């Protein structure tokens, strides 16, 4: 056996070379620039061994093939030329793999992403396991980049241009059966026989060429291709609002390769990669990636977590059902649900059943796996089965006496070490724990709806919460697949506190006569996934406005909303999407395609509905209030760092990730510019825009959130 640092070559007795990939000291395999020499040394041995029948690339890691290229390599590039050179080096290495004179098979188990999939594409055939951990994709667009090692050229030729565009423009990841159907892999097998199946495929002298589906063959022709790219460009521009330059370059590069040939395509790919790597959008998106990775590693406190073997949930409603699903089906923990009636329990069970059944229908999991996961969830109308639960999450109504009663009942019916975690969105955790016998084991755990989709949770200790309770709760959130940030027990916590003035200002502009669709379109153009008015409809107008009095009582008039407007809307039985009417009207089952602004909303609030502000002015008014409040949260140590503030806003409310989060965005604008803009808006619209003390101080000292050592205040 010849051994290198991350690649091991073993020639079997049947003359098939097996190259095992195992980056030392790392949980996952990533491709690094220094590995090129190691791979080339192995390729040289393979070329020189004339007796070889084939080659298999396989990972020695337990649950991943190659998770991608090491993104740090891009950060070391000083200019576009250096990044372009990096791409060309990757392209050359993949070309050398593809040029091997014997069949080359990629045997894939676990994540095969980015540079990992580009390497698999350079192999002659691909075979993967049917494991749920196996996913294949090119997610570079999510970092403001495009695949730089040949992915934009090989993938369209393998699966067809339409499928390739969809994969590369969205960064979507395909599971094993999806990859097989798309033609991305040639076979799907159990993990136990992956190597032998790959070896047998490598021994075949002739590997049959795959024929593209008729639709893809039509789209590959000049006329079909022209129509496809015209439609894709239009659809992509509508979706990105011009905020993500990588998508435009991806389309251009793929089209170049198909129209002018692979050589021109590879050249265009490398140049585009180099240029995109230097864009502020890519730098911001990579910063979000690194920050989220750090947050996921953060234990929350210095204390070791307590036991976490099973969880209880109080309330089987929308939130309770979602929390049960992420706990059992993502976290793998047994869950016991308590509700006052069996209907609530049945609702929670159906919630998980529906999500799992969808996965079965899409062939993401087998029916047996669905049943296995569902078996982790049980329910009761009393506290039977709760005595041994390590942590209990309450998801009942936002009523302080009720939540205090839940604390007392859990302390009476559960173990002495059981943690009580409240999913409150507005009530102080200290008040919920006020009468607790063990207040050190009471904490907030604020999920966002829909629970199965929203990645963020806020972990909220109160003054007496123990360090171990924090660590255990953070550990649970991570097991649930969430990204947790620890925030202070102050009104609104962090996410709702910065969101409220943003939505309030949108409502205020409505009362000034601005049109609903104009306000929403302005913020979508700025980079939010939906506008503030639509967001209020989605959350529920009754639910979304409930926190406003709490915030106004805590922080004063800057949180006041036009109360008469909110009351008029609620009195007209407008709750948003959930009852089919809010600021928008919704068609049958609330389908988005049927959504349209209800003209009656203007009469209801007593305005004509004629927009006078530009889109930039609308966005500025909403966003500046959000940024100012985020800076206050930093100053008051509501968040522990600018890192947590950026991740909380991006993952919790969809703050434009290409701006890096509110704190990176404020740094980009500069504190002096922030203060000047807020002062200008305060002169126009009132003292709610007055710049906070934190920003004024930073402007005077010319400081930044991310560069002055203030990014980790809590530790």
Swiss-Prot record:
Site (Important for catalytic activity): 118, 140
GO biological process: fatty acid beta-oxidation
Keyword Cytoplasm applies: yes
TM stretches of this protein: none
Any GO CC annotation of this UniProt entry: cytoplasm
Catalytic reaction annotation: a (3S)-3-hydroxyacyl-CoA = a (2E)-enoyl-CoA + H2O; a 4-saturated-(3S)-3-hydroxyacyl-CoA = a (3E)-enoyl-CoA + H2O; a (3S)-3-hydroxyacyl-CoA + NAD(+) = a 3-oxoacyl-CoA + NADH + H(+); (3S)-3-hydroxybutanoyl-CoA = (3R)-3-hydroxybutanoyl-CoA
InterPro entries assigned to the protein according to its UniProt record, in alphabetical order: 3-OHacyl-CoA_DH_CS, 3-OHacyl-CoA_DH_NAD-bd, 3HC_DH_C, 6-PGluconate_DH-like_C_sf, ClpP/crotonase-like_dom_sf, Enoyl-CoA_hydra/iso, FA_oxidation_alpha_subunit, FadJ
GO MF terms, alphabetically ordered: 3-hydroxybutyryl-CoA epimerase activity; enoyl-CoA hydratase activity; long-chain-3-hydroxyacyl-CoA dehydrogenase activity; NAD+ binding
Region (Enoyl-CoA hydratase) location: 1-190
Protein localization: Cytoplasm
Lyase keyword on record: yes
HAMAP family: FadJ
Function per UniProt: Catalyzes the formation of a hydroxyacyl-CoA by addition of water on enoyl-CoA. Also exhibits 3-hydroxyacyl-CoA epimerase and 3-hydroxyacyl-CoA dehydrogenase activities.
NCBIfam families reported in the protein's UniProt record: FadJ, PRK11154.1
Name of the protein this chain belongs to: Fatty acid oxidation complex subunit alpha
Protein's organism: Salmonella heidelberg (strain SL476)
Underlying gene: fadJ
């Amino acid at each position: 056996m010849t051994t290198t640092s991350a690649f091991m070559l073993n020639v079997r007795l049947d003359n098939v070379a097996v190259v095992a990939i195992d980056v030392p000291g790392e949980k996952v395999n990533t491709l690094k620039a220094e590995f090129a020499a190691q791979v080339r040394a192995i390729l040289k041995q393979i070329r020189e061994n004339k007796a070889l029948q084939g080659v298999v690339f396989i990972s020695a890691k337990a649950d991943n093939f190659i998770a991608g290229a090491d993104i740090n390599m891009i950060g070391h590039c000083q200019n576009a030329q250096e990044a372009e050179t990096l791409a060309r080096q990757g392209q050359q290495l993949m070309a050398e793999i593809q040029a091997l004179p014997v069949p080359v098979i990629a045997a894939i188990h676990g994540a095969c992403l980015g540079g990992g999939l580009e390497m698999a594409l350079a192999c002659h055939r691909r075979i993967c396991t049917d494991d749920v951990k196996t996913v294949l994709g090119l997610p570079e667009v999510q970092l403001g980049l495009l695949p730089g090692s040949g992915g934009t050229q090989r993938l369209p030729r393998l699966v067809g241009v339409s499928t390739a565009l969809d994969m590369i423009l969205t960064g979507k990841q395909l599971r094993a059966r999806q990859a097989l159907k798309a033609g991305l892999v040639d076979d799907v097998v159990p993990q136990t026989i992956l190597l032998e199946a790959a070896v047998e495929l490598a021994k075949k002298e002739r590997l049959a060429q795959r024929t593209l589906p008729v639709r893809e063959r039509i789209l590959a022709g000049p006329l079909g291709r022209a129509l496809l790219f015209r439609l894709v460009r239009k659809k992509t521009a509508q979706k990105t609002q011009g905020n993500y330059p990588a998508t435009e370059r991806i389309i251009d590069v793929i089209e170049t390769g198909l129209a002018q040939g692979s050589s021109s395509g590879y050249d265009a790919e490398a140049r585009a990669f180099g240029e995109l790597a230097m864009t502020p959008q890519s730098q911001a998106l990579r910063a979000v990636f690194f920050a989220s990775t750090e947050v996921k590693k953060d234990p929350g406190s210095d204390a070791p977590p307590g036991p976490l073997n099973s969880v209880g949930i109080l309330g089987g409603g929308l939130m309770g059902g979602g929390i049960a699903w992420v706990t059992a089906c993502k976290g793998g923990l047994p869950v016991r649900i308590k509700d006052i009636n069996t209907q609530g329990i049945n609702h929670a069970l159906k919630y998980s059943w529906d999500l799992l059944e969808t996965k079965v229908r899409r062939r993401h999991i087998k029916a047996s796996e669905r049943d296995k996961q569902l078996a982790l969830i049980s329910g009761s109308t009393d506290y039977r089965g709760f005595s041994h639960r390590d942590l209990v999450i309450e998801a009942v109504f936002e009523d302080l006496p009720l939540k205090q009663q839940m604390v007392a009942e859990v302390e009476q019916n559960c173990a002495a070490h059981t943690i009580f975690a409240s999913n409150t969105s507005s009530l102080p955790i200290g008040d919920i724990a006020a009468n607790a016998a063990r207040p050190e084991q009471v904490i907030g755990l604020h999920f966002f709806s829909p629970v199965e989709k929203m990645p963020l949770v806020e972990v909220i200790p109160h003054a007496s919460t123990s360090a171990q309770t924090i660590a255990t709760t953070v550990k649970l959130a991570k097991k649930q697949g969430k990204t947790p940030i620890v925030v202070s027990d102050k009104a609104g916590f962090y996410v709702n506190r910065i969101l409220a003035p943003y939505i309030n200002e949108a409502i205020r502009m409505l009362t000034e006569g601005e049109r609903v669709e104009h306000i929403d379109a302005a913020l979508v153009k700025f980079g939010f996934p939906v506008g503030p008015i639509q967001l209020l409809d989605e959350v529920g107008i009754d639910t979304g406005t409930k926190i406003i009095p709490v915030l106004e009582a805590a922080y004063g008039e800057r949180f006041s909303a036009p109360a008469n407007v909110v009351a008029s809307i609620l009195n007209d039985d407008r709750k948003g999407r959930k009852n089919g009417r809010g600021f928008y009207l919704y068609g049958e089952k609330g389908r988005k395609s049927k959504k349209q602004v209800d003209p009656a909303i203007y009469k209801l609030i007593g305005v004509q509905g004629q927009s006078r502000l530009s889109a930039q002015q609308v966005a500025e008014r909403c966003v500046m209030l959000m940024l100012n409040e985020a800076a206050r949260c930093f100053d008051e140590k509501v968040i522990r760092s600018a890192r947590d503030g950026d991740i909380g806003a991006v993952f919790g409310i969809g703050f434009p990730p290409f701006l890096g989060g509110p704190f990176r965005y404020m740094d980009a604008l500069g504190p002096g510019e922030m203060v000047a803009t807020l002062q200008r808006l305060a002169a126009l619209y009132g003292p709610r825009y007055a710049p906070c003390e934190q920003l004024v101080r930073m402007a005077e000292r010319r400081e930044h959130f991310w560069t002055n050592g203030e990014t980790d205040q809590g530790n």
